[in-house]
Amino acid sequence: MNLFVYIAQNPTLTKWFFCCVCTILTMPFFKKPYRKRGISRTPYEWLTYADKCVIELSKSELKPNEEKELPKDIKEDCKTVEEKEKVVPRKPLQSEGINEDDSQKNGELIVLHGINHQAAMLTACGLFMVTSSNTNKWKIAFASFLLGMFFTQFGFQKSERSINAEKLESIEKPENDN
């Protein structure tokens, strides 16, 4: 109990205590989006992929020395191993979220993609601490804290609707060959 009295009497400790409490309380709201690189998948996608592989292997019942037969049209086209790999690429499973490869192809850079909530809260708390040097201006300090939290969460990211709308516009635009 004496610790809380000491914190309440010291304005600097009160600010730091308030920032720590806000960081802990807002933890569920700052979720790190799952990042896709190459063929990486979410744990659920790995489980479904493994289940499909096990089912496929159990159906085919191949012995270790046997090769799986390719469909006829692929057999005729492929002459070497490299051509087989070009003709039959493994398709990754679909996952929710933003694909980094798509954003890099379109030249868009999402600034806060993958930022964790501690870095966002550090920015917000720093803004709060700088603006609240005078404790009489607590309303401005609290508003700046909330604005800092809001912009670290939503300020630099594009919504899925705007990204999908841009993709539709780029598909619908006819290209002139003149």
From Swiss-Prot:
Keyword Transmembrane helix applies: yes
Transmembrane domains' residue ranges: 13-30
Organism: Schizosaccharomyces pombe (strain 972 / ATCC 24843) (Fission yeast)
Cytoplasmic compartment spans: 1-12
Coiled coil: none
Membrane topology type: Single-pass type II membrane protein
Functional description taken from the UniProt entry: Has a role in meiosis.
Disulfide bonds: none
Localization terms from the record: Endoplasmic reticulum membrane
Keyword Membrane applies: yes
Keywords: Endoplasmic reticulum, Membrane, Signal-anchor, Transmembrane, Transmembrane helix
Protein name (database record): Meiotically up-regulated gene 95 protein
Segments on the Lumenal face: 31-178
GO CC annotations, alphabetized: endoplasmic reticulum; endoplasmic reticulum membrane
